[in-house]
From Swiss-Prot:
Its EC number is 1.1.1.-. One of its GO terms (biological process) is terpenoid biosynthetic process. Disulfide bonds: none annotated. This is Short-chain dehydrogenase/reductase eupG. Keywords: NADP, Oxidoreductase. Eupenifeldin is a bistropolone-humulene meroterpenoid first discovered as an antitumor and anti-leukemia agent. This metabolite also shows anthelmintic activity against the parasitic worm Hemonchus contortus, anti-malarial activity as well as antifungal activity. NADP(+) binds at residues 19, 71, 98, 188, 192, 223.
């Protein structure tokens, strides 16, 4: 069994792009040393390319990284990744549940049927996240740090309270009659509401083990959650007012560092400067 020495061993799913990559960048910029497992699905070269970019951006960093092939929608992939991490390290200090899917637009483009889009979105954002966490949780309990952390990534669109209050024009009542106007991002929004319950439950389950559990809402970021069409998706999000993903990466890195530890219990969804209503 190998060890990363004094470095904080941190696994970030979906870390080759988007918020996951921006979180890795933010950690590489810190003076504290991290050893980051750059999780990616598909081809391991995606993680290797991301690591090469990290090393290019931060040549003097004390942190290191290695690729980890993991697709949280696959039980086999989760099991293989767990076996790899368990054999090489035997523990984890930080887990960031970043991998996610937003496939609502795939319906309007004709790539997926509604059922396919809903099933795949929930499979990643809810089922996959739960099964991945369930598998890797024992490694957090074996952490070499005093305060292991488990982080979930929710969305501002997941708040049922804000939906009920009509706090956004998107929640305005629909006109009478049929057909109704399209409901935007409902598969994604509802899946993140489901994720909120998972995060709250893990906070309860791990409370007496000393694992700090966070559920963070990083804001509307110009990330690509869908697939290899991410660049076009990012352009569309910017046009709608999305902020740079690096802002979310800094927020997540602050949580990793422990700057929001006092907010870990009772369970809540954390925005950058406030608590997000359930």
């Amino acid at each position: 069994m190998n060890s990363a020495g004094p470095k904080c061993v941190t696994l970030i799913t979906g870390a080759n792009t988007g918020l996951g990559f921006e979180t890795a960048k933010a950690l590489f910029a810190r003076p504290e040393p991290y050893h980051i497992l750059v999780g990616c699905r598909g081809q391991i070269s995606r993680a290797e390319d991301a690591i090469e970019e990290l090393q290019h951006l931060f040549p003097g960093t004390a942190s290191t990284a290695q690729p980890l092939l993991i697709d949280i929608s696959s039980d086999k992939s989760i099991a293989l990744a767990f076996a790899e991490v368990q054999e090489e390290f035997g523990y984890l200090d930080i887990v960031v549940n970043n991998a996610g899917a937003d496939l609502d637009t795939a319906v309007s483009s004709g790539r997926l049927t509604k059922r396919e889009a809903w099933n795949q979105t929930w499979d990643v954002n809810v089922t996959g996240t739960q099964l991945f966490t369930e598998t890797f949780a024992p490694l957090l309990l074996a952490s070499k740090t005093q305060l292991p952390r488990l982080i979930f990534i929710t969305s501002g669109l997941s708040s049922i309270t804000e939906h009920a209050n009509g706090s956004s024009p998107r929640y305005a009542l629909a006109p009478a009659g049929w057909p109704k106007p399209d409901t935007l991002f409902l598969a994604y929004r509802s899946s993140k509401s489901g994720l909120n319950m998972i995060a709250a439950e893990w906070a309860r389950v791990l409370r007496n083990d000393g694992v700090k559990v966070f559920n963070i809402s990083p804001g509307f970021l110009d990330t690509g959650l869908g697939d290899d069409r991410a660049s076009a998706e990012r352009r569309e999000k910017r046009a709608l007012g999305a902020i740079d993903a690096s802002v979310g990466g800094e927020f997540c890195a602050n949580v990793v560092e422990g700057k929001l530890d006092e907010q870990s219990w009772p369970s809540k969804a954390l925005r950058k400067n406030t608590v997000q209503p359930w």
